[in-house]
Protein backbone atom coordinates (compact mmCIF):
# COMPACT_ATOMS: atom_id res chain seq x y z
CA UNK A 1 0.00 0.00 0.00
CA UNK A 2 1.42 3.37 -1.02
CA UNK A 3 1.70 6.36 1.27
CA UNK A 4 -1.03 8.13 -0.70
CA UNK A 5 -3.39 5.18 -0.27
CA UNK A 6 -2.71 5.15 3.47
CA UNK A 7 -3.68 8.81 3.63
CA UNK A 8 -6.86 8.12 1.67
CA UNK A 9 -7.73 5.24 3.99
CA UNK A 10 -7.18 7.51 6.97
CA UNK A 11 -9.44 10.20 5.55
CA UNK A 12 -12.20 7.70 4.72
CA UNK A 13 -12.03 6.05 8.15
CA UNK A 14 -12.11 9.44 9.89
CA UNK A 15 -15.01 10.53 7.70
CA UNK A 16 -16.87 7.31 8.46
CA UNK A 17 -16.43 7.83 12.21
CA UNK A 18 -17.65 11.43 11.98
CA UNK A 19 -20.63 10.37 9.86
CA UNK A 20 -21.49 7.67 12.41
CA UNK A 21 -21.31 10.22 15.24
CA UNK A 22 -23.54 12.57 13.27
CA UNK A 23 -26.11 9.78 12.90
CA UNK A 24 -26.13 9.37 16.69
CA UNK A 25 -27.11 12.95 17.48
CA UNK A 26 -28.66 14.74 14.49
CA UNK A 27 -32.34 14.83 13.57
CA UNK A 28 -35.50 13.21 14.92
CA UNK A 29 -38.90 12.60 13.39
CA UNK A 30 -41.25 10.66 11.15
CA UNK A 31 -40.31 6.98 10.61
CA UNK A 32 -37.81 6.96 13.47
CA UNK A 33 -40.46 8.11 15.91
CA UNK A 34 -42.96 5.68 14.38
CA UNK A 35 -40.68 2.71 15.02
CA UNK A 36 -39.94 3.80 18.59
CA UNK A 37 -43.59 4.37 19.50
CA UNK A 38 -44.56 0.95 18.13
CA UNK A 39 -42.01 -0.64 20.45
CA UNK A 40 -43.23 1.54 23.31
CA UNK A 41 -46.70 0.11 22.72
CA UNK A 42 -45.26 -3.41 22.92
CA UNK A 43 -43.65 -2.65 26.26
CA UNK A 44 -46.83 -1.00 27.59
CA UNK A 45 -48.70 -4.22 26.88
CA UNK A 46 -50.56 -3.32 23.69
CA UNK A 47 -50.92 -6.61 21.85
CA UNK A 48 -49.74 -7.04 18.27
CA UNK A 49 -52.59 -7.77 15.85
CA UNK A 50 -54.91 -6.94 18.72
CA UNK A 51 -54.74 -3.46 20.18
CA UNK A 52 -52.08 -2.46 17.65
CA UNK A 53 -53.11 -1.77 14.05
CA UNK A 54 -49.83 -0.39 12.69
CA UNK A 55 -48.94 -1.79 9.28
CA UNK A 56 -45.24 -2.17 10.20
CA UNK A 57 -45.69 -3.68 13.66
CA UNK A 58 -43.91 -6.95 12.81
CA UNK A 59 -40.67 -4.96 12.54
CA UNK A 60 -40.76 -3.75 16.14
CA UNK A 61 -38.99 -6.68 17.81
CA UNK A 62 -35.42 -5.32 17.83
CA UNK A 63 -36.35 -1.86 19.10
CA UNK A 64 -38.67 -3.42 21.67
CA UNK A 65 -35.85 -5.52 23.11
CA UNK A 66 -33.35 -2.67 23.25
CA UNK A 67 -35.91 -0.27 24.75
CA UNK A 68 -36.95 -2.85 27.34
CA UNK A 69 -33.29 -3.33 28.28
CA UNK A 70 -32.72 0.43 28.50
CA UNK A 71 -35.73 0.95 30.75
CA UNK A 72 -34.69 -1.98 32.90
CA UNK A 73 -31.29 -0.36 33.47
CA UNK A 74 -32.26 3.33 33.72
CA UNK A 75 -35.83 3.14 34.98
CA UNK A 76 -37.21 5.35 32.19
CA UNK A 77 -36.97 6.42 28.58
CA UNK A 78 -35.00 9.67 28.81
CA UNK A 79 -32.32 9.54 26.11
CA UNK A 80 -33.56 6.25 24.65
CA UNK A 81 -33.41 7.54 21.06
CA UNK A 82 -29.63 7.99 21.16
CA UNK A 83 -29.31 4.58 22.83
CA UNK A 84 -31.26 2.95 20.00
CA UNK A 85 -29.07 4.72 17.45
CA UNK A 86 -26.01 3.38 19.21
CA UNK A 87 -27.46 -0.15 19.10
CA UNK A 88 -28.22 0.25 15.40
CA UNK A 89 -24.70 1.51 14.73
CA UNK A 90 -23.25 -1.48 16.56
CA UNK A 91 -25.35 -3.91 14.51
CA UNK A 92 -24.31 -2.13 11.33
CA UNK A 93 -20.66 -2.33 12.36
CA UNK A 94 -20.89 -6.05 13.07
CA UNK A 95 -22.44 -6.67 9.65
CA UNK A 96 -19.68 -4.57 8.07
CA UNK A 97 -17.15 -6.89 9.71
CA UNK A 98 -19.02 -9.88 8.25
CA UNK A 99 -18.92 -8.22 4.81
CA UNK A 100 -15.17 -7.72 5.24
CA UNK A 101 -14.58 -11.36 6.16
CA UNK A 102 -16.59 -12.66 3.19
CA UNK A 103 -14.93 -10.21 0.77
CA UNK A 104 -11.47 -11.11 2.05
CA UNK A 105 -11.80 -14.86 2.54
CA UNK A 106 -14.38 -15.96 -0.01
CA UNK A 107 -13.87 -13.43 -2.80
CA UNK A 108 -10.13 -12.82 -2.22
CA UNK A 109 -10.66 -9.06 -2.56
CA UNK A 110 -7.61 -6.81 -2.14
CA UNK A 111 -9.98 -4.00 -1.18
CA UNK A 112 -12.03 -5.91 1.39
CA UNK A 113 -11.64 -3.21 4.03
CA UNK A 114 -12.79 -0.53 1.60
CA UNK A 115 -15.76 -2.69 0.58
CA UNK A 116 -16.70 -3.04 4.26
CA UNK A 117 -16.32 0.71 4.71
CA UNK A 118 -18.71 1.27 1.80
CA UNK A 119 -21.24 -1.01 3.48
CA UNK A 120 -20.80 0.78 6.82
CA UNK A 121 -21.75 4.08 5.18
CA UNK A 122 -24.92 2.74 3.54
CA UNK A 123 -28.16 3.99 5.07
CA UNK A 124 -31.58 3.59 3.38
CA UNK A 125 -32.87 6.61 5.31
CA UNK A 126 -31.32 9.24 7.53
CA UNK A 127 -31.68 7.18 10.69
CA UNK A 128 -29.65 4.53 12.47
CA UNK A 129 -32.06 2.88 14.90
CA UNK A 130 -33.19 -0.73 14.22
CA UNK A 131 -35.99 0.60 12.00
CA UNK A 132 -37.76 -1.46 9.33
CA UNK A 133 -35.72 -0.07 6.41
CA UNK A 134 -32.40 -0.70 8.17
CA UNK A 135 -33.57 -4.13 9.29
CA UNK A 136 -34.57 -5.05 5.75
CA UNK A 137 -31.08 -4.11 4.58
CA UNK A 138 -29.37 -6.01 7.42
CA UNK A 139 -31.36 -9.21 6.98
CA UNK A 140 -31.06 -9.10 3.19
CA UNK A 141 -27.31 -8.79 3.64
CA UNK A 142 -27.30 -11.81 5.95
CA UNK A 143 -29.45 -13.77 3.50
CA UNK A 144 -27.04 -13.21 0.62
CA UNK A 145 -23.87 -13.69 2.67
CA UNK A 146 -25.16 -16.96 4.15
CA UNK A 147 -25.88 -18.15 0.62
CA UNK A 148 -22.37 -17.14 -0.45
CA UNK A 149 -20.87 -19.01 2.51
CA UNK A 150 -22.91 -22.10 1.65
CA UNK A 151 -21.59 -22.31 -1.90
CA UNK A 152 -18.03 -21.11 -1.27
CA UNK A 153 -17.32 -22.67 2.13
CA UNK A 154 -18.17 -26.33 1.73
CA UNK A 155 -21.99 -26.39 1.33
CA UNK A 156 -22.59 -26.65 5.06
CA UNK A 157 -26.27 -26.94 5.89
CA UNK A 158 -26.08 -24.42 8.72
CA UNK A 159 -25.62 -21.68 6.13
CA UNK A 160 -28.84 -22.71 4.40
CA UNK A 161 -30.61 -22.57 7.76
CA UNK A 162 -29.12 -19.14 8.39
CA UNK A 163 -30.22 -18.04 4.93
CA UNK A 164 -33.82 -19.12 5.58
CA UNK A 165 -33.94 -17.53 9.04
CA UNK A 166 -32.47 -14.26 7.75
CA UNK A 167 -35.05 -14.14 4.97
CA UNK A 168 -37.83 -14.82 7.49
CA UNK A 169 -36.65 -11.91 9.63
CA UNK A 170 -36.41 -9.73 6.52
CA UNK A 171 -40.08 -10.48 5.82
CA UNK A 172 -40.95 -9.43 9.38
CA UNK A 173 -39.08 -6.18 8.79
CA UNK A 174 -40.81 -5.60 5.44
CA UNK A 175 -43.62 -8.10 4.67
CA UNK A 176 -43.43 -7.55 0.90
CA UNK A 177 -39.93 -9.08 0.99
CA UNK A 178 -41.70 -12.41 0.61
CA UNK A 179 -40.91 -11.71 -3.06
CA UNK A 180 -37.33 -12.65 -2.23
CA UNK A 181 -38.19 -16.32 -1.61
CA UNK A 182 -38.89 -17.42 -5.22
CA UNK A 183 -35.93 -15.33 -6.38
CA UNK A 184 -33.67 -16.95 -3.79
CA UNK A 185 -34.80 -20.45 -4.73
CA UNK A 186 -34.13 -19.68 -8.40
CA UNK A 187 -30.59 -18.56 -7.51
CA UNK A 188 -29.95 -21.74 -5.54
CA UNK A 189 -31.24 -23.84 -8.44
CA UNK A 190 -28.99 -22.07 -10.95
CA UNK A 191 -25.83 -22.04 -8.83
CA UNK A 192 -25.99 -25.48 -7.21
CA UNK A 193 -24.23 -28.23 -9.13
CA UNK A 194 -25.71 -31.00 -6.99
CA UNK A 195 -28.51 -31.50 -4.46
CA UNK A 196 -30.50 -28.65 -5.98
CA UNK A 197 -33.84 -29.89 -4.69
CA UNK A 198 -32.51 -30.58 -1.20
CA UNK A 199 -31.01 -27.09 -0.88
CA UNK A 200 -34.20 -25.41 -2.10
CA UNK A 201 -36.37 -27.49 0.23
CA UNK A 202 -34.05 -26.69 3.16
CA UNK A 203 -34.36 -22.92 2.68
CA UNK A 204 -38.07 -22.97 1.84
CA UNK A 205 -38.76 -25.33 4.75
CA UNK A 206 -36.93 -23.05 7.18
CA UNK A 207 -38.98 -20.08 5.99
CA UNK A 208 -42.23 -22.06 6.18
CA UNK A 209 -41.47 -23.36 9.67
CA UNK A 210 -40.65 -19.84 10.86
CA UNK A 211 -43.89 -18.50 9.38
CA UNK A 212 -45.97 -21.27 10.96
CA UNK A 213 -44.42 -20.66 14.38
CA UNK A 214 -44.98 -16.91 14.12
CA UNK A 215 -48.59 -17.11 12.93
CA UNK A 216 -49.25 -20.04 15.25
CA UNK A 217 -48.42 -17.90 18.27
CA UNK A 218 -51.16 -15.40 17.44
CA UNK A 219 -53.64 -18.15 16.59
CA UNK A 220 -53.05 -19.81 19.97
CA UNK A 221 -53.16 -16.46 21.76
CA UNK A 222 -56.52 -15.53 20.23
CA UNK A 223 -57.99 -19.02 20.30
CA UNK A 224 -58.45 -19.14 16.54
CA UNK A 225 -57.40 -17.61 13.27
CA UNK A 226 -60.56 -15.55 12.65
CA UNK A 227 -59.48 -12.75 15.00
CA UNK A 228 -56.08 -12.49 13.34
CA UNK A 229 -57.64 -12.35 9.87
CA UNK A 230 -60.10 -9.67 10.98
CA UNK A 231 -57.32 -7.53 12.46
CA UNK A 232 -55.17 -7.87 9.35
CA UNK A 233 -58.18 -6.78 7.30
CA UNK A 234 -58.66 -3.69 9.46
CA UNK A 235 -54.95 -2.86 9.21
CA UNK A 236 -55.19 -3.00 5.42
CA UNK A 237 -58.31 -0.82 5.24
CA UNK A 238 -57.62 1.58 8.13
CA UNK A 239 -54.09 2.55 7.11
CA UNK A 240 -54.88 6.01 5.73
CA UNK A 241 -51.20 6.90 5.34
CA UNK A 242 -50.87 4.32 2.55
CA UNK A 243 -54.27 4.72 0.89
CA UNK A 244 -52.64 5.93 -2.30
CA UNK A 245 -49.96 3.27 -2.53
CA UNK A 246 -51.81 0.81 -4.74
CA UNK A 247 -53.36 0.84 -8.17
CA UNK A 248 -52.33 1.79 -11.65
CA UNK A 249 -51.69 5.47 -10.89
CA UNK A 250 -48.98 4.58 -8.39
CA UNK A 251 -47.19 2.25 -10.80
CA UNK A 252 -47.45 4.80 -13.57
CA UNK A 253 -45.57 7.25 -11.33
CA UNK A 254 -42.98 4.57 -10.58
CA UNK A 255 -42.51 3.92 -14.31
CA UNK A 256 -42.11 7.65 -14.88
CA UNK A 257 -39.49 7.74 -12.12
CA UNK A 258 -37.73 4.77 -13.70
CA UNK A 259 -37.67 6.74 -16.93
CA UNK A 260 -35.84 9.54 -15.13
CA UNK A 261 -33.16 7.08 -14.02
CA UNK A 262 -32.97 5.63 -17.52
CA UNK A 263 -32.40 9.06 -19.05
CA UNK A 264 -29.79 10.03 -16.46
CA UNK A 265 -27.96 6.72 -16.83
CA UNK A 266 -28.04 6.88 -20.63
CA UNK A 267 -26.72 10.45 -20.66
CA UNK A 268 -23.92 9.59 -18.24
CA UNK A 269 -22.97 6.49 -20.23
CA UNK A 270 -22.80 8.54 -23.45
CA UNK A 271 -20.45 11.01 -21.77
CA UNK A 272 -18.38 8.14 -20.35
CA UNK A 273 -18.21 6.52 -23.80
CA UNK A 274 -16.97 9.73 -25.42
CA UNK A 275 -14.35 10.21 -22.72
CA UNK A 276 -13.01 6.67 -23.10
CA UNK A 277 -13.33 6.22 -26.86
CA UNK A 278 -12.44 9.67 -28.15
CA UNK A 279 -10.23 11.20 -25.47
CA UNK A 280 -8.57 8.20 -23.77
CA UNK A 281 -8.79 5.94 -26.86
CA UNK A 282 -9.34 2.77 -24.82
CA UNK A 283 -8.90 -0.62 -26.45
CA UNK A 284 -12.10 -2.42 -27.39
CA UNK A 285 -11.47 -5.26 -24.93
CA UNK A 286 -11.30 -2.84 -21.98
CA UNK A 287 -13.79 -0.29 -23.25
CA UNK A 288 -16.92 -1.50 -21.44
CA UNK A 289 -15.18 -1.74 -18.07
CA UNK A 290 -13.71 1.74 -18.47
CA UNK A 291 -17.07 3.18 -19.51
CA UNK A 292 -18.71 1.66 -16.42
CA UNK A 293 -15.96 3.01 -14.14
CA UNK A 294 -16.24 6.47 -15.66
CA UNK A 295 -20.04 6.43 -15.44
CA UNK A 296 -19.92 5.59 -11.73
CA UNK A 297 -17.50 8.45 -11.07
CA UNK A 298 -19.69 10.90 -13.00
CA UNK A 299 -22.81 9.74 -11.15
CA UNK A 300 -21.07 10.30 -7.82
CA UNK A 301 -20.24 13.84 -8.89
CA UNK A 302 -23.82 14.53 -9.99
CA UNK A 303 -25.22 13.17 -6.71
CA UNK A 304 -22.81 15.33 -4.70
CA UNK A 305 -24.07 18.37 -6.61
CA UNK A 306 -27.66 17.49 -5.65
CA UNK A 307 -26.65 17.08 -2.01
CA UNK A 308 -24.12 19.83 -1.43
CA UNK A 309 -24.89 22.51 -4.02
CA UNK A 310 -28.64 22.13 -4.58
CA UNK A 311 -29.35 21.06 -0.96
CA UNK A 312 -31.94 18.48 -2.00
CA UNK A 313 -31.72 16.35 1.15
CA UNK A 314 -30.55 12.77 1.55
CA UNK A 315 -33.32 10.79 -0.13
CA UNK A 316 -33.34 12.49 -3.50
CA UNK A 317 -32.34 10.47 -6.58
CA UNK A 318 -29.31 8.41 -5.40
CA UNK A 319 -28.09 8.33 -8.97
CA UNK A 320 -24.82 6.70 -7.91
CA UNK A 321 -26.80 3.68 -6.68
CA UNK A 322 -28.68 3.24 -9.96
CA UNK A 323 -25.57 3.66 -12.11
CA UNK A 324 -23.49 1.38 -9.89
CA UNK A 325 -26.08 -1.40 -10.19
CA UNK A 326 -26.04 -1.10 -13.98
CA UNK A 327 -22.23 -1.04 -13.91
CA UNK A 328 -22.26 -4.17 -11.75
CA UNK A 329 -24.24 -6.08 -14.36
CA UNK A 330 -21.73 -4.88 -16.95
CA UNK A 331 -18.83 -6.06 -14.75
CA UNK A 332 -20.46 -9.49 -14.60
CA UNK A 333 -20.31 -9.88 -18.37
CA UNK A 334 -16.75 -8.52 -18.44
CA UNK A 335 -15.58 -10.89 -15.71
CA UNK A 336 -13.08 -13.71 -15.62
CA UNK A 337 -14.33 -15.72 -12.62
CA UNK A 338 -16.16 -18.98 -13.11
CA UNK A 339 -19.41 -19.59 -11.31
CA UNK A 340 -20.59 -19.65 -8.61
CA UNK A 341 -18.67 -16.53 -7.47
CA UNK A 342 -19.75 -14.21 -10.28
CA UNK A 343 -23.28 -15.57 -10.40
CA UNK A 344 -23.72 -15.12 -6.64
CA UNK A 345 -22.59 -11.49 -6.87
CA UNK A 346 -24.94 -10.87 -9.78
CA UNK A 347 -27.71 -12.44 -7.71
CA UNK A 348 -26.89 -9.99 -4.92
CA UNK A 349 -27.31 -7.07 -7.33
CA UNK A 350 -30.55 -8.39 -8.81
CA UNK A 351 -31.79 -9.24 -5.32
CA UNK A 352 -31.55 -5.59 -4.33
CA UNK A 353 -33.72 -4.74 -7.33
CA UNK A 354 -36.28 -7.29 -6.08
CA UNK A 355 -36.03 -5.63 -2.65
CA UNK A 356 -36.67 -2.23 -4.19
CA UNK A 357 -39.72 -3.63 -5.99
CA UNK A 358 -41.03 -5.00 -2.68
CA UNK A 359 -40.49 -1.64 -1.01
CA UNK A 360 -42.34 0.13 -3.82
CA UNK A 361 -45.32 -2.16 -3.20
CA UNK A 362 -45.75 -0.95 0.39
CA UNK A 363 -44.26 2.53 0.52
CA UNK A 364 -46.21 5.75 0.03
CA UNK A 365 -43.11 7.41 -1.48
CA UNK A 366 -42.04 7.53 -5.11
CA UNK A 367 -39.02 5.82 -6.63
CA UNK A 368 -36.94 9.02 -6.76
CA UNK A 369 -36.70 9.03 -2.97
CA UNK A 370 -36.63 5.24 -2.44
CA UNK A 371 -33.63 4.11 -4.50
CA UNK A 372 -31.29 4.29 -1.50
CA UNK A 373 -32.94 1.05 -0.34
CA UNK A 374 -31.06 -0.73 -3.16
CA UNK A 375 -27.69 0.53 -1.95
CA UNK A 376 -26.51 -2.89 -0.78
CA UNK A 377 -26.26 -3.90 -4.43
CA UNK A 378 -23.27 -1.58 -4.75
CA UNK A 379 -21.28 -3.85 -2.43
CA UNK A 380 -21.78 -6.81 -4.77
CA UNK A 381 -21.08 -4.61 -7.80
CA UNK A 382 -17.69 -3.44 -6.49
CA UNK A 383 -16.74 -7.05 -5.73
CA UNK A 384 -17.62 -7.94 -9.33
CA UNK A 385 -15.33 -5.14 -10.48
CA UNK A 386 -12.37 -7.09 -9.07
CA UNK A 387 -13.12 -9.95 -11.46
CA UNK A 388 -12.94 -7.95 -14.68
CA UNK A 389 -10.41 -8.85 -17.39
CA UNK A 390 -7.41 -6.47 -17.42
CA UNK A 391 -3.98 -6.25 -19.07
CA UNK A 392 -2.07 -4.46 -16.32
CA UNK A 393 -2.89 -5.82 -12.86
CA UNK A 394 -1.11 -3.03 -10.97
CA UNK A 395 -2.81 -0.31 -13.02
CA UNK A 396 -6.17 -2.03 -12.54
CA UNK A 397 -5.63 -2.25 -8.78
CA UNK A 398 -5.11 1.51 -8.63
CA UNK A 399 -8.22 2.15 -10.72
CA UNK A 400 -10.37 -0.10 -8.55
CA UNK A 401 -9.03 1.55 -5.41
CA UNK A 402 -9.79 5.01 -6.81
CA UNK A 403 -13.29 3.95 -7.86
CA UNK A 404 -14.09 2.51 -4.44
CA UNK A 405 -12.58 5.50 -2.64
CA UNK A 406 -14.74 7.98 -4.59
CA UNK A 407 -17.84 5.87 -4.02
CA UNK A 408 -17.07 5.60 -0.30
CA UNK A 409 -16.49 9.35 -0.04
CA UNK A 410 -19.82 10.01 -1.75
CA UNK A 411 -21.59 7.78 0.76
CA UNK A 412 -19.82 9.50 3.66
CA UNK A 413 -21.01 12.91 2.46
CA UNK A 414 -24.56 11.63 2.09
CA UNK A 415 -24.58 10.00 5.51
CA UNK A 416 -22.61 12.63 7.38
CA UNK A 417 -23.65 15.93 5.80
CA UNK A 418 -27.23 15.66 4.57
CA UNK A 419 -30.49 15.32 6.48
CA UNK A 420 -33.88 14.00 5.47
CA UNK A 421 -35.17 16.89 3.41
CA UNK A 422 -37.65 19.23 5.05
CA UNK A 423 -38.54 22.87 4.69
CA UNK A 424 -35.41 24.26 6.35
CA UNK A 425 -33.37 21.29 7.59
CA UNK A 426 -31.62 19.46 4.75
CA UNK A 427 -28.04 19.41 6.04
CA UNK A 428 -26.18 19.51 9.34
CA UNK A 429 -25.20 23.17 8.89
CA UNK A 430 -28.87 24.10 9.23
CA UNK A 431 -29.02 22.66 12.76
CA UNK A 432 -30.33 25.29 15.13
CA UNK A 433 -31.48 23.71 18.39
CA UNK A 434 -31.37 20.68 20.67
CA UNK A 435 -34.06 18.54 22.25
CA UNK A 436 -33.56 18.86 26.00
CA UNK A 437 -35.87 16.34 27.64
CA UNK A 438 -37.51 12.97 27.39
CA UNK A 439 -36.87 10.12 24.95
CA UNK A 440 -35.12 12.29 22.34
CA UNK A 441 -32.97 14.26 24.81
CA UNK A 442 -29.66 15.22 23.20
CA UNK A 443 -30.87 15.14 19.58
CA UNK A 444 -30.02 18.15 17.42
CA UNK A 445 -32.78 19.37 15.08
CA UNK A 446 -34.24 22.40 13.35
CA UNK A 447 -35.53 25.27 15.49
CA UNK A 448 -39.28 24.64 15.08
CA UNK A 449 -39.09 20.95 16.01
CA UNK A 450 -36.98 21.68 19.09
CA UNK A 451 -39.14 24.58 20.25
CA UNK A 452 -42.38 22.61 20.04
CA UNK A 453 -40.88 19.48 21.61
CA UNK A 454 -39.19 21.29 24.52
CA UNK A 455 -42.07 23.61 25.37
CA UNK A 456 -44.65 20.83 25.26
CA UNK A 457 -42.48 18.70 27.54
CA UNK A 458 -42.19 21.60 30.01
CA UNK A 459 -45.98 21.98 29.98
CA UNK A 460 -46.37 18.21 30.44
CA UNK A 461 -44.52 18.46 33.74
CA UNK A 462 -47.28 20.70 35.12
CA UNK A 463 -49.93 17.98 34.76
CA UNK A 464 -50.08 14.32 35.78
CA UNK A 465 -50.59 12.06 32.79
CA UNK A 466 -48.84 9.01 34.23
CA UNK A 467 -50.58 5.97 32.70
CA UNK A 468 -53.46 8.18 31.51
CA UNK A 469 -55.42 7.09 28.45
CA UNK A 470 -54.15 9.69 25.98
CA UNK A 471 -55.04 10.54 22.40
CA UNK A 472 -52.64 12.90 20.62
CA UNK A 473 -54.21 14.82 17.73
CA UNK A 474 -51.64 16.16 15.28
CA UNK A 475 -51.78 17.13 11.61
CA UNK A 476 -48.04 17.80 11.27
CA UNK A 477 -46.26 15.11 9.26
CA UNK A 478 -42.62 15.87 10.06
CA UNK A 479 -42.93 16.94 13.71
CA UNK A 480 -42.46 14.14 16.29
CA UNK A 481 -45.65 14.77 18.24
CA UNK A 482 -46.47 11.12 18.88
CA UNK A 483 -43.48 11.15 21.25
CA UNK A 484 -45.77 13.06 23.62
CA UNK A 485 -47.23 9.68 24.58
CA UNK A 486 -43.89 8.76 26.14
CA UNK A 487 -43.38 11.97 28.13
CA UNK A 488 -45.37 10.58 31.06
CA UNK A 489 -45.64 6.97 29.85
CA UNK A 490 -49.29 7.39 28.91
CA UNK A 491 -51.41 4.69 27.32
CA UNK A 492 -51.97 5.19 23.58
CA UNK A 493 -55.63 5.43 22.54
CA UNK A 494 -55.24 5.40 18.76
CA UNK A 495 -55.36 2.18 16.77
CA UNK A 496 -52.28 3.28 14.79
CA UNK A 497 -49.62 5.91 15.45
CA UNK A 498 -48.38 5.94 11.86
CA UNK A 499 -47.48 9.45 10.74
CA UNK A 500 -49.74 11.04 9.59
CA UNK A 501 -52.41 9.63 11.91
CA UNK A 502 -56.07 9.82 10.96
CA UNK A 503 -58.98 10.84 13.15
CA UNK A 504 -62.48 9.78 12.12
CA UNK A 505 -65.30 7.38 13.00
CA UNK A 506 -62.88 4.45 12.95
CA UNK A 507 -61.68 5.62 16.36
CA UNK A 508 -65.19 5.10 17.77
CA UNK A 509 -65.21 1.58 16.32
CA UNK A 510 -61.83 0.91 17.91
CA UNK A 511 -62.90 2.21 21.33
CA UNK A 512 -66.10 0.16 21.15
CA UNK A 513 -64.06 -2.96 20.42
CA UNK A 514 -61.56 -2.13 23.17
CA UNK A 515 -63.31 -0.02 25.86
CA UNK A 516 -60.12 0.14 27.93
CA UNK A 517 -58.62 2.25 25.13
CA UNK A 518 -61.20 5.07 25.34
CA UNK A 519 -59.29 8.31 26.09
CA UNK A 520 -59.31 10.27 29.35
CA UNK A 521 -57.20 13.06 27.86
CA UNK A 522 -57.04 14.42 24.32
CA UNK A 523 -53.99 16.51 23.42
CA UNK A 524 -54.63 18.71 20.37
CA UNK A 525 -51.77 20.28 18.45
CA UNK A 526 -51.95 24.09 18.50
CA UNK A 527 -50.37 27.01 16.70
CA UNK A 528 -50.23 30.26 18.65
CA UNK A 529 -52.61 28.71 21.17
CA UNK A 530 -55.29 27.74 18.64
CA UNK A 531 -56.02 24.14 17.57
CA UNK A 532 -54.45 23.25 14.24
CA UNK A 533 -57.34 20.96 13.20
CA UNK A 534 -60.23 23.11 12.01
CA UNK A 535 -63.50 23.25 13.93
CA UNK A 536 -65.18 21.43 11.03
CA UNK A 537 -62.93 18.37 11.41
CA UNK A 538 -64.51 15.21 12.83
CA UNK A 539 -62.09 15.00 15.74
CA UNK A 540 -62.76 18.58 16.89
CA UNK A 541 -66.51 18.01 16.72
CA UNK A 542 -66.04 14.88 18.81
CA UNK A 543 -63.90 16.72 21.37
CA UNK A 544 -66.23 19.69 21.76
CA UNK A 545 -69.58 17.87 21.48
CA UNK A 546 -69.12 14.30 22.74
CA UNK A 547 -65.97 13.97 24.83
CA UNK A 548 -67.43 15.46 28.05
CA UNK A 549 -64.18 17.04 29.22
CA UNK A 550 -64.16 18.80 32.58
CA UNK A 551 -60.89 20.71 32.31
CA UNK A 552 -58.82 22.43 29.63
CA UNK A 553 -55.08 23.06 29.97
CA UNK A 554 -53.82 25.46 27.31
CA UNK A 555 -50.39 26.39 26.01
CA UNK A 556 -48.87 27.84 22.85
CA UNK A 557 -48.37 24.48 21.09
CA UNK A 558 -50.89 22.10 22.69
CA UNK A 559 -54.30 22.11 24.34
CA UNK A 560 -55.30 19.33 26.74
CA UNK A 561 -58.95 18.34 27.08
CA UNK A 562 -59.22 16.31 30.30
CA UNK A 563 -62.05 14.33 31.83
Language-model segment annotations:
Residues 128-137:
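Short acidic/glycine- and proline-prone juxtamembrane loop motifs at membrane-interface regions
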Residues 24-40, 44-66, 78:
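Extracytoplasmic catalytic/substrate-binding loops of multi-pass membrane glycan-assembly enzymes
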Residues 94-122:
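Transmembrane-helix signature of polytopic, membrane-embedded enzymes
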Residues 143-169, 196-205, 343-350:
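Short hydrophobic alpha-helices at membrane interfaces in multi-pass membrane enzymes
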Residues 222, 407-563:
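Extracytoplasmic
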Residues 105-110, 141-160, 194-195, 328-340:
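Membrane-interface transmembrane helices that cradle and orient dolichyl/undecaprenyl
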Residues 124, 146, 158-175, 181-186, ...:
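Membrane-interface alpha helices of multi-pass inner-membrane proteins
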Residues 146, 152, 180-216, 273-279:
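Perimembrane helix-loop-helix junctions
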Amino acid sequence: MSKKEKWIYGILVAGSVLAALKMLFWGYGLDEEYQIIMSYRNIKGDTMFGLMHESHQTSSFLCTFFMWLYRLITGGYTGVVIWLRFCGTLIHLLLSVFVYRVAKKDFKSDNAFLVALIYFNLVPKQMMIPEFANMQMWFFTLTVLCLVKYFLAGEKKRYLTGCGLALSLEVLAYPSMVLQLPFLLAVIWLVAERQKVRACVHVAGTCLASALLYVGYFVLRDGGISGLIATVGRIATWDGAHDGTTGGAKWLIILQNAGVYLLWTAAICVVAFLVNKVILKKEKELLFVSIADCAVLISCGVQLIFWVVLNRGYEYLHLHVAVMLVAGVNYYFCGKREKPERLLLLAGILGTVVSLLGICILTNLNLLVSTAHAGVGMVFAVLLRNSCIVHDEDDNRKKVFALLAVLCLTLIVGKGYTMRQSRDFSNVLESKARLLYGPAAGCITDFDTAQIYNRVYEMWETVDLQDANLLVVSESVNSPMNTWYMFDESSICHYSIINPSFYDERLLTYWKMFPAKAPDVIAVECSEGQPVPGADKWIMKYVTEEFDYTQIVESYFVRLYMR
